[in-house]
A protein has these predicted regions:
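Glycine-rich beta-strand-centered segment in the early N-terminal region that forms part
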Residues: 20-35, 48-109
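Glycine-rich cofactor phosphate-binding loops and adjacent beta1-alpha1 units
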Residues: 200-208, 217-302
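Mid-domain Rossmann-like dinucleotide-binding core that forms the NAD(H)/NADP(H) cofactor-binding site
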Residues: 141-143, 147-236
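Rossmann-fold dehydrogenase core element
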Residues: 280-282, 293-332
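NAD(P)H dinucleotide-binding glycine-rich loop of Rossmann-like/cofactor-binding domains
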Residues: 90-183
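C-terminal hydrophobic helical "lid"/dimerization subdomain
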Residues: 1, 169, 239, 269, ...
Length: 366
């Protein structure tokens, strides 16, 4: 089988590898398509400081495929099932902070303190390889069977589910309820645009899409429908707070901050101050600066500010059900697909993605 491999000098090649039987707890998947992150080139070239697997390894995070074989101790998955793969693997042991990794991408800290624990590094050594290959060997716990009603959907379209999974984790963390008003900071970005579409599908009565790219926000509103309003942020917290409150028709119930690589927290702060008493702010972005929280304002407003690393294991199944029922239209995604041997072109296209764009690598039929 063919697979992309990243070497210790960060060079990458498409090579032939022998197929192997899945180990205990593992599943061999014939890959159909895998999404390409906008920053994947930077990751696999070592420019973002991620804790990459030992080289050589196969990159790639999520994907769509068909089960070919299962290892011992796998009880529910069967050959022939179409599945969605996600990279978040956490040790299934009764410990307060289980080790976790993102397969094919990085080892992660069990908590926000200290470096990468040896147990996380060991977990990554056991499962180093991702989805940019014709076959992927994955732990059964990161696979979700897709409903038969999605069998006719092209795999390149279904990878859009992975784009939606990250903001879904944030909305679950915040406890989004139908009828609530939602602010999305970073709405013109890769995950932020997905958050806007998803919040409408989940029943938000009003969604304010906030960002700096006015044209991208207007394109998003045209697709998302009449419950979505847009705010082009100015960088002035007081002014932006006023605009957000006005667009929401009053103070909002919750805000999802999902801005990538921000060098200021002004927009995040504006979203916080646009919340009602008891409002919730979920932080999933990657700002490189502190967020100032006033003690009195936090106390007087009963605000909840929380972080969210990723999404629960049942999110792919929830999203698949929404897509199968028609509540979530994956057709709004602008998918650009490349065959496996054109990864370099896919990386270039992914780096230019905006809004609802999706870049996928395809491995064969469907």
């Amino acid at each position: 089988m063919r697979a992309w491999r990243v070497n210790s000098d960060f060079s990458r090649f498409l090579v032939e590898l022998p197929e192997r039987a899945p180990p205990p707890g593992g599943v061999l998947v014939r890959m159909q398509a895998a999404p390409v992150l906008s920053y994947l080139r930077e990751v696999i070239e070592g420019r973002l400081g991620y804790s990459l697997p030992s080289a050589p390894f196969t990159p790639g995070t999520n994907g769509i495929g068909v089960v070919e074989a299962v290892g011992a101790g796998v009880y529910h998955l069967r050959p022939g099932q179409r599945v969605i793969l996600d990279p978040h693997l956490a040790v299934d042991e009764r410990t307060p902070e289980p080790a976790q990794i993102l397969i094919g991408l990085t080892a992660t800290r069990s908590s926000g303190f200290g470096g990468i624990a040896e147990v996380a590094a060991a977990l990554q050594r056991d499962w180093p390889d991702g989805t940019l290959a014709e076959r992927a060997c994955m732990p059964a716990s990161v696979l979700t069977s897709l409903p038969a009603s999605l069998d006719g959907e092209p795999a390149a379209r279904l990878v859009g589910l992975s784009k939606l999974a990250v903001p879904y984790g944030g909305f679950l963390r915040a406890g989004l309820q139908a009828g609530e008003t939602v602010l999305v900071n970073g709405a013109s970005g890769y995950f932020g645009s997905a958050a806007v579409i998803l919040s409408v599908a989940l029943g938000a009565s009003r969604v304010v899409a906030a960002g700096r790219d006015r044209a991208a926000l207007e394109r998003l509103r045209a697709v998302a429908g009449p419950r979505v309003a847009t705010v082009t942020l100015s960088g002035d917290r007081s002014r932006d707070t006023e605009w957000l409150v006005d667009a929401a028709g009053g103070r909002a119930d919750l805000a999802l901050d999902i801005v990538g690589h921000a060098n200021t927290a002004t927009a995040t702060s504006a979203c916080l101050y646009a919340l009602r008493r008891g409002g919730r702010l979920v932080m999933m972005g990657s700002a490189n600066v502190p967020l100032e929280l006033g003690f009195y304002d936090m106390l007087a407003n009963d605000w909840h500010v929380m972080g969210c690393f990723t999404y629960p294991a049942d999110v792919p199944a929830r999203l698949a059900a929404l897509a199968a029922s028609g509540q979530l239209d994956l057709g709004v995604m602008n998918v650009r697909a490349f065959p496996l041997d054109r990864l370099e072109d896919a990386l270039e296209a992914a780096a230019r993605m905006r809004g609802l764009d999706v870049t996928a690598v395809t491995m064969g039929a469907r």
